Amino acid sequence: MEYAVTNMRLLSNMMYSASAISFPRVRLHCSIPTEPSCRRNPFRQSNQPVQVPSPKLACFDGVLTEAFQRLDVSENNSPVEAFAYVLELCGKRRAVSQGRQLHSRIFKTFPSFELDFLAGKLVFMYGKCGSLDDAEKVFDEMPDRTAFAWNTMIGAYVSNGEPASALALYWNMRVEGVPLGLSSFPALLKACAKLRDIRSGSELHSLLVKLGYHSTGFIVNALVSMYAKNDDLSAARRLFDGFQEKGDAVLWNSILSSYSTSGKSLETLELFREMHMTGPAPNSYTIVSALTACDGFSYAKLGKEIHASVLKSSTHSSELYVCNALIAMYTRCGKMPQAERILRQMNNADVVTWNSLIKGYVQNLMYKEALEFFSDMIAAGHKSDEVSMTSIIAASGRLSNLLAGMELHAYVIKHGWDSNLQVGNTLIDMYSKCNLTCYMGRAFLRMHDKDLISWTTVIAGYAQNDCHVEALELFRDVAKKRMEIDEMILGSILRASSVLKSMLIVKEIHCHILRKGLLDTVIQNELVDVYGKCRNMGYATRVFESIKGKDVVSWTSMISSSALNGNESEAVELFRRMVETGLSADSVALLCILSAAASLSALNKGREIHCYLLRKGFCLEGSIAVAVVDMYACCGDLQSAKAVFDRIERKGLLQYTSMINAYGMHGCGKAAVELFDKMRHENVSPDHISFLALLYACSHAGLLDEGRGFLKIMEHEYELEPWPEHYVCLVDMLGRANCVVEAFEFVKMMKTEPTAEVWCALLAACRSHSEKEIGEIAAQRLLELEPKNPGNLVLVSNVFAEQGRWNDVEKVRAKMKASGMEKHPGCSWIEMDGKVHKFTARDKSHPESKEIYEKLSEVTRKLEREVGYVADTKFVLHNVDEGEKVQMLHGHSERIAIAYGLLRTPDRACLRITKNLRVCRDCHTFCKLVSKLFRRDIVMRDANRFHHFESGLCSCGDSW
């Protein structure tokens, strides 16, 4: 009898473990009935046959209730298997309260020798119900644990998110010498997959080979899944290829799922096609894996083909799981109309369906549509969850729609989702993008649980909204909490430090990075950029040279830093070195280098860069087109700038504004006005910047009436409140027209308090037209508003010098010296043979300085002899004798650059020169005479505008 009972228990254990422990995925994927056909129903009576439905159906058909009733009726006569069966039903239905009742009855009913078998069933039931404490208690109290009990406890740990405990129990099982059966391994391999423990997984694989179980179908499935989740797809593929019996769809699903979840789209789809041609018929899980692999626009066609095959199948076309996967596929491929069509055809859409659509709208930048869809969803009575709220709050943030964001925040609080970590992080980001840092801070403080993303988002939010001190304080909190700091936090805090221009803080963060070993290429690139913005090129260069694997961002950061600190020539040289390394410049690098070429007025370099970007396939559109137009304009080649502008297919406000500005720089005011009118005719509405460029053009072309009219149009027609810069242009315009008194009256009648720039423009007009009284007032107001601006002090000093007030000049210069302020030295540069040559006043550092000065003296003597040139020393604003004044004029940087150009270029070649300050009137006369006598066109760009000298005349009309 005992022998029979023992055999019966073993048989029951084998059947139970095979169906419930070893084959859970197989049962789901292949629709194999949970109850084996040979399993005997313990409630069957000889005189009344009963057909017991599967446990899955029992959850809904009342079999559990019926089973309890039968136990109540015939408790004393019920066999052990009846209680085991009811425990199994409790586990399947997660009916833990009924299971506990049954637990109590079992220990009251059965003798101890029969409890071992039922104890294993109790462990299974509690594990299925998620009650690990009860399962552990039953397991620990078992005097004689069977192999089934060990396996069941391992499975309970794995299914309840305790894979480490499962592996620990396995090692205890090995120590106690419990024999291993085939059913032990699937759960253990799943634990290794969850823990990403490739070492333990490989050991289990070796043990399976030793025991001869490695070629069993469901074991191969588990091994494939384990290796794939440990990022060893090659091992998973070797197992799959080496397995001969590929008639099981579950095996194909395992390898397909492995490739799909690892982002191997092409390999997944190739396997799917192979399965379709040679393997078993795909089931719903196969289709979902294939659809998951269709990620992006390039896979849209394949996704449609899979969709077509689904429609042909009457089985899969209506399955919720498949329909949701189809919707997700179309959203990833950017095909939102197709995704919506599937939703309209579904009768069983769930919250996952709605979430997929909302997420799709957000991923495809259709934020407004996402908000409308969510509103319709709620109005139709459908429920949302934390996932949908995360997506829809993100959409409102991208739109900077504060009202919608606050309404969603209230909705979240109402439903109790504000404690959700992802929702909280998204709320922080939304308020950050809406520039509402006070609400962002409150949302952050209200979060019960904060992760690294929470801290990163709030620090980035403060940094992006110019709350740099708050960002630094939070960073210090993160450091104190010893949290793991990632590159996102470091990037945000470094950018905040660069805005504050605090070298002390930057060095402190740099030291923290070095101490924690966080230095990588991304952080090094950020450091180069930050040190450059803090005007410390020494540190920037040192960090840049220490980068081992320099990428395009490294070079771009260094190029940008060099250009920012006035080292445009170095920026051009860095770009050349980058191209020689074989790296291709991106749009950011091209924008930086085009700006550097524009600053240098290096036309040849600019043309080389233009050719480079065309060779690399960059389109002349957007910011690239604007930069190329600006480069040619700043290099004095207005014709090329116009040609590039004409080739731009889609002209927007930025493109029109750049060309209007180009016309203004070259004194072509009428052309600027005509282009502005054309822009308005094309229904492109101007903004503050475009009006500023237009007023600048009118000012330098003497179009006073037009300028006044455009200021009125700006205010009344477009309802744009003028900036101080617009008023500066009008004051400058009036000053150039010798309407200094009217300019002064305009300044006094301004709606807003005049800025230092307005008084500076008025003072410059007074200087040009010798208006002493108004100039005195303007100088006084300028010094009151910006007493420490060296440019303003130099202007005031020059005004005093022209009036012969040398004592006042000395006072101003003494004030500058005491404050440590220095006047920017005048310098000019000229591009020659692909190199930019820079000269300062009376500069003798050039290798050819002897020949240059000889040429300059020769030119000056020829001008004096043939056209009667006499140096106008009244423009020398120093209290020295006449001879010294003549020598000072003779050594001005633009004259040295002209002499070098005459020395190194052939006759009649155009000279292109750039000066960082306004060209003085005597040098202006000198340039006109050189252009006439030597038959040279000279294009000079000074701090105010371009001068085109030709045949003794200048494009500025001697007014600049």
From Swiss-Prot:
GO biological-process terms attached to the record: chloroplast RNA processing; mRNA processing; RNA modification
One GO MF term attached to the UniProt entry: zinc ion binding
GO cellular component term of the entry, any: chloroplast
Keywords assigned: Chloroplast, mRNA processing, Plastid, Repeat, Transit peptide
Stretches forming PPR repeats: 79-109, 115-145, 146-180, 181-215, 216-246, 248-282, 283-317, 319-349, 350-384, 385-419, 420-450, 451-485, 486-516, 520-550, 551-585, 586-620, 621-651, 652-686, 687-717, 723-753
Disruption phenotype: No visible phenotype under normal growth conditions.
InterPro entries in UniProt: DYW_dom, E_motif, Eplus_motif, Pentatricopeptide_rpt, PPR_At4g14850-like_plant, TPR-like_helical_dom_sf
Region (Type DYW motif) residue spans: 865-960
Chain residue ranges for the region called Type E(+) motif: 834-864
Chief localisation class: plastid
Region span, Type E motif: 758-833
Family (UniProt): Belongs to the PPR family. PCMP-H subfamily.
Protein's name according to its UniProt entry: Pentatricopeptide repeat-containing protein At3g63370, chloroplastic
Organism listed in the record: Arabidopsis thaliana (Mouse-ear cress)
